[in-house]
């Protein structure tokens, strides 16, 4: 059966629409410019725009939280595609969506880190949420 399942039971993304009640799953970006006050402030701004934040240390497990409705959004900057590929397929199978920036599929999957946002498709979130942190806004 096509879709995302936990055992024999289908899973679906949450239907939450209130960002203040939503859970963001994320990770601390590798190569983060910790001494850059603007980047730190921008990252904190992203985190505090959600009701809850979860950092569990595994991109794929974080994406599984989105797929099962335990989290509403997963966002991370500077992550390698192989760390998220399987999780993105699970989110997609559970009815969620995702956006990638910085990876040219399929030939670019082994080269540069990318930025990803996956969600239940109920929030206005995109990879541009990291623009201020990256000094692009």
Language model: regions and residue ranges:
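An extended, acidic
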Residues: 12-137
